[in-house]
Curated annotation (Swiss-Prot):
Membrane topology: Multi-pass membrane protein
Keyword Isomerase among record annotations: no
Domain ABC transmembrane type-1 as annotated: residue spans: 291-515
GO molecular function, one term: ABC-type maltose transporter activity
Similarity-based family: Belongs to the binding-protein-dependent transport system permease family. MalFG subfamily.
Subunit annotation: The complex is composed of two ATP-binding proteins (MalK), two transmembrane proteins (MalG and MalF) and a solute-binding protein (MalE).
Name used for this protein in its record: Maltose/maltodextrin transport system permease protein MalF
Length: 524
């Protein structure tokens, strides 16, 4: 009995050892994840990326809670999906909507503190400049400055690892050592630019070029309130204009006058970007035109691909047709080729001067359409190309749905004397419409945001005339947003692009809701 108890006593710790290891490994991994993400959060916060830091905290806290608690064991399986949805859908959406209420652009990217720091780092030359030469002596390097025909030299110093910030200049009769080439000065420009040289008369000079030192002083001085800047050159007083996101001169009454000073900083401007969309005719008119074209393009694409796909599916399902498998394979091939390759091939085929399509049309009918310069022909070309890209998908769907329709229905209709039109309208379409509806809605939504087709085929062109932001006749809303964000006439206007993207989100959401309700009514 004692031996059995002794055996149990010996095996108990051994049995619990693997469990202890698992616990240790588990908490070690969780601790490592927490520490790394905590460090990343600190870095983001220190650089002013508060939104990304907050996102990291939320995702990390959720992960530690879910994987660290036994009560939330079941949630471990859905956490990756939830985290992905937050990271790739909810956060970008919220971030985009947030940017829509700011002036964030290529000219207004910095925070207020960073923009102020950039202005305070600016300097200007307040006095004469003096040529200098860098000499290499046996003991080290020496800077020699020429002032009014007199040579002034610094003490000898070691250029490698140079950390001095103040050096006194003393008169010399002749420079010693060899002159360093310009590439040495360029290589060590950062170290040399941080040096203040003290002239015998008490003036300080700093490096103002690759060959000159000059009396350089700060352009702006920060006042006691921590916001106002004083221009030492023009004696102007500047204050931050929180309505436009720039420093701007003010008069004696504190009113903003004159031009703004770059760089700008990000400020909240409320609904100004949305008001620009509706009030600025240079934005409103192309926006409405592009919105209508986007709806028409998406709808026509769905209709054309469905009609062609259904007809071809019916043909390749025809039992009397020989070689159906070969035809089926050939018709599916466009779907197998990557879309961007097909688009670029069509771009060459539709070339107005050397494209094979225009050569064929000119040879047969004597016409040469302006596919890329005429708005109507450009839209026609886009529909042709997109139909080519999309009909194999619809054909595959229709082939499967046609197979699912019982032959008994067609046999019964044949007994009643129905023709193929009656069969199509009374049997085929009703049987196919219900399963096809969600797929047609998905196809409409995909083409609503078909950025790749527009960007690769026409780039949105031909361009509209008289618009405030770049816009083209073949632009979709998504490509229009892209052009505002990255090709804006006044620079990259991310705030306005975010406002347009927010409107697109609301429009697509409304269309999806309407489609779902219509589908539900049709099913009922």
């Amino acid at each position: 009995m004692q031996s059995v108890q002794g055996t149990n006593a010996m095996t108990a710790p051994e049995a619990s050892l693997p469990s202890s290891k698992k616990v240790f490994i588990k908490w070690s991994l969780l601790g490592t994840v927490g520490i790394l993400n905590g460090y990343a959060t600190i870095l983001m916060y220190s650089r002013g990326e508060i939104a990304f830091a907050l996102l990291t905290i939320i995702l990390t806290a959720l992960a530690l809670f879910i994987f660290g608690s036994k009560k939330t064991y079941a949630h471990r399986y859905i956490y990756p999906g939830i985290a992905g949805m937050i990271l790739f859908i909810l956060f970008p959406l919220a971030y985009t909507i947030g940017l829509a209420f700011t002036n964030y652009s290529a000219k207004n990217q910095l925070s207020f503190d960073r923009a102020q720091s950039v202005l305070l780092d600016r300097t200007y030359q307040s006095g004469d400049s003096y040529p200098f030469t860098l000499y290499n002596t046996d003991q080290g390097h020496q800077i020699v400055v020429e002032k009014d025909g007199e040579l002034l030299a610094t003490p000898v110093f070691q250029l490698q690892g140079f950390s001095e910030t103040d050096l006194d200049l003393a008169p010399i009769t002749e420079a010693a050592g060899d002159k360093e080439p310009i590439k040495t000065i360029v290589k060590n420009r950062t170290a040399l630019s941080s040096v203040d040289l003290h002239l015998p008369n008490g003036d300080d000079i700093r490096m103002s070029g690759l060959r000159k030192f000059a009396a350089v002083v700060p352009l702006y001085t920060l006042q006691e309130d921590g916001e106002t800047l004083y221009n030492n050159r023009t004696q102007e007083t500047l204050r931050p204009n929180m309505e436009v996101g720039y420093y701007q001169p003010v008069d004696e009454n504190g009113q903003f006058v004159g031009s703004t000073v770059s760089p700008g900083f990000v400020v909240n401007i409320g609904t100004h970007n949305f008001e620009r969309v509706w009030k600025d005719d240079g934005i409103k008119e192309p926006f409405i035109s592009i919105f209508i074209w986007t709806i028409v393009f998406s709808a026509l694409t769905v209709v054309c691909t469905l009609v062609i796909g259904l007809v071809l599916a019916s043909v390749v399902q025809w039992e009397a047709l020989k070689g159906r498998s070969i035809y089926r394979l050939l018709l599916i091939l466009p779907y197998a080729v990557p879309a961007f390759i097909s688009i670029l091939i069509f771009k060459g085929l539709f070339n107005q001067s050397f494209g094979e399509i225009n050569m064929l049309l000119e040879g047969l009918f004597g016409i040469s359409p302006a596919w890329f310069s005429d708005p109507f022909m450009a839209k026609t070309m886009i529909l042709i190309v997109n139909t080519w890209l999309g009909f194999p998908y619809m054909m595959i769907l229709c082939m499967g749905l046609l197979k699912a329709i019982p032959d008994d229905l067609y046999e019964a209709s044949a007994i009643d004397g129905a023709n193929f039109i009656t069969n199509f309208t009374r049997i085929t379409m009703p049987m196919m419409l219900k399963p096809l509806t969600p797929l047609l809605i998905a196809s409409f939504a995909f083409n609503f945001n078909n950025f790749v087709l527009i960007q690769l085929l026409t780039g949105g062109g031909p361009n509209m005339i008289g618009t405030s932001e770049p816009a083209g006749y073949t632009d979709l809303l998504v490509s229009y947003t892209y052009r505002i964000a990255f090709e804006g006439a006044g620079g990259q206007d991310f705030g306005l692009a975010s406002a347009v993207a927010t409107l697109i989100f609301l429009l697509v959401g409304a269309l999806a809701l309407i489609n779902l309700r219509v589908t539900k009514v049709a099913q009922d």
